[in-house]
């Protein structure tokens, strides 16, 4: 079992993943586990500290979430955040009750006592609150470390036990010294060293791959995106003579994608590529399918069938490698008290029985870490900083049924969007940009004629790891040019809209 410096127990907060991200940015390896993980599994990870995340529940409610009480007897530092703070207070017999004044947003706190968390930080600072319950009295054995206008127990702790509790969220950007607070917990309370980086990760993963695979061969599925490209490069660094790299044209690719991928692997990466045209089988199975979860699962199952058929043509192929990320795992499974968001075609969309064993060397890291790993492995910036493209391709960017006509419309619109962003320098400033073909038509006027055609939505977002995102504030003149060109150049589209929702509450992809 892989060891972790710090374990984050997930009680359902939308910010839980950010806790792990902030620690990893400091060179400390943090891993997220469900709140009800067993004490034995915690001990097996040999952590140096534990963090209890926030969450939507109330500790006094009948449906409250509780972790194993034994974590408070492991002689390990524990940091409780929001719900985690209230859980710690409740465990040590303090009263937690509904707050008369709910706090959502920025608040000012004042440090009342020097302590490990706030070492070398200002006495007054701005933090981000998001809670509707409050701790009414100090738990026995603890002391107040900081206060806010609405909370005399905003931060409390027991420095002998190295237990600390925060009512606010240090993991979000709005807490101005939040990253420093988490770093201080790791460094001064847990004695963690900042030694985890992509160089050490690459070395460890290469060793694991060699050990697991032995003399067998690995089928490596690639899409041309950064995730699968990094997987291929990592496998090549470990077992180059044992990998068979396969690209499947599922008929759901962007314009020119197949040719770009083939050129990149053969000429830029120097890796032999087997290209399979399976567009007919994919598109035939998507006829009359409109439900997004069904689309993902059909595509996931079909990919595996195609890969397994290819594997039969080669001797000793026992493994299938994929570019599954930590974010895919999180969104496709129930982690702690968090809910499933969507099935990813290479996680929740996989069939239960496969003839090939899975290798997912990136499943413990986030997107920005994958990019750093790619650079570490010698991939070019052009490859590493390509915008993410989902495994199910354009199928989940077409609302409703997928067919050749709708795919052609979407491809043409997408080409224009990317051309405009690249020519204005905005492509490299954004995380992801794409068009969505909506399953609605609208009335328009072109020339002197009435039209009743399709609408396209433009989605352009800024993000660092894909767990959260905000819509990109593109200049109006760029949006105007994109809209004008799509409507004038793509017959069958008469309306363009811009998606200004953030993640959360929306996801980046529409399906």
From Swiss-Prot:
Pathway terms, separated by semicolons: Purine metabolism; GMP biosynthesis; GMP from XMP (L-Gln route): step 1/1
Catalytic residue list: 82 (nucleophile), 169, 171
Reaction(s) catalysed by this chain's protein: XMP + L-glutamine + ATP + H2O = GMP + L-glutamate + AMP + diphosphate + 2 H(+)
Alphabetical UniProt keywords: ATP-binding, Glutamine amidotransferase, GMP biosynthesis, Ligase, Nucleotide-binding, Purine biosynthesis
EC number(s) reported in the record: 6.3.5.2
Domain of life: Bacteria
Domain spans labelled Glutamine amidotransferase type-1: 5-195
Residue span(s) of domain GMPS ATP-PPase: 196-386
Enzyme class: ligase
Pfam families the record matches: GATase, GMP_synt_C, NAD_synthase
Positions bound to ATP: 223-229
A single GO cellular-component term on record: cytosol
Gene Ontology MF terms: ATP binding; GMP synthase activity
Assembly information from the UniProt record: Homodimer.
Function: Catalyzes the synthesis of GMP from XMP.
NCBIfam families recorded: guaA_Cterm, guaA_Nterm, PRK00074.1
Name of the protein this chain belongs to: GMP synthase [glutamine-hydrolyzing]
């Amino acid at each position: 079992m892989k060891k972790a410096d710090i374990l984050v127990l997930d009680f359902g907060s939308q910010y839980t993943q950010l806790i792990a991200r902030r620690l990893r940015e400091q060179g400390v390896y943090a891993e997220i586990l469900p709140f009800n993980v067993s004490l034995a599994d915690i001990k097996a990870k040999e952590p140096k500290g534990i963090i209890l995340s926030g969450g939507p529940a109330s500790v006094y409610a009948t449906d409250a979430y509780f972790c194993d009480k034994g974590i408070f007897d492991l002689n390990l530092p524990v940091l409780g955040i929001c719900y985690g703070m209230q859980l710690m207070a409740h465990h040590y017999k303090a009263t937690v009750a509904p707050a008369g004044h709910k706090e959502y947003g920025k608040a000012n706190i004042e440090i009342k006592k020097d302590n490990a968390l706030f070492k070398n930080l200002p006495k007054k600072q701005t933090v981000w609150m998001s809670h509707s319950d409050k701790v009414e009295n100090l738990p026995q054995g603890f002391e107040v470390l900081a206060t806010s206008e609405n909370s005399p127990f905003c931060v409390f702790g027991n420095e002998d036990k190295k237990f600390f509790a925060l009512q606010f969220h240090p993991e979000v950007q709005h807490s101005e010294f939040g990253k420093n607070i988490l770093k201080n917990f790791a460094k001064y309370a847990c004695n963690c060293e900042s030694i985890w980086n992509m160089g050490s990760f690459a070395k460890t993963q290469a060793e694991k791959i060699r050990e697991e695979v032995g003399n067998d061969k690995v089928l490596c599925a690639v899409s041309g995106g950064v995730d699968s490209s990094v997987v291929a490069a990592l496998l090549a660094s470990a077992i180059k003579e044992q990998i068979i790299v396969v690209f499947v044209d599922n008929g759901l690719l962007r314009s020119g994608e197949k040719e770009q991928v083939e050129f990149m692997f053969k000429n830029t990466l120097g890796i032999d590529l087997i290209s399979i045209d399976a567009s007919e089988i994919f598109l035939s199975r998507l006829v009359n399918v409109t439900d997004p979860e069904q689309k993902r699962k059909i595509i996931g199952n079909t990919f595996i069938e195609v890969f397994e058929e290819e594997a039969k043509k080669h001797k000793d192929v026992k493994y299938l490698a994929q570019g599954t990320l930590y974010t895919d795992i999180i969104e496709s499974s129930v982690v702690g008290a968090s809910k499933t968001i969507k099935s990813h075609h290479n996680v929740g969309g996989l069939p239960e029985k496969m003839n090939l064993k899975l290798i997912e060397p990136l499943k413990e890291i986030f997107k920005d870490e994958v990019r750093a790993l790619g650079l570490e492995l010698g991939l070019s910036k052009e490859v590493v900083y390509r915008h993410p493209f989902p495994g199910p391709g354009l199928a989940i960017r077409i609302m409703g049924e997928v067919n050749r006509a709708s795919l052609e419309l979407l491809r043409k619109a997408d080409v224009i969007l990317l051309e405009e962003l690249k020519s204005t320098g905005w492509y490299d400033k954004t995380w992801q940009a794409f068009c969505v073909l909506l399953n609605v038509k609208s009335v328009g006027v072109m020339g002197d004629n009435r039209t009743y055609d399709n609408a396209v939505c433009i989605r352009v977002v800024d993000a660092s790891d894909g767990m959260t995102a905000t819509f990109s504030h593109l200049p109006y003149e760029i949006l105007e040019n994109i809209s004008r060109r799509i409507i004038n150049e793509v017959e069958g589209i008469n309306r363009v809209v811009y998606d200004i929702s953030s993640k959360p509450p929306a996801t980046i992809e529409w399906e």
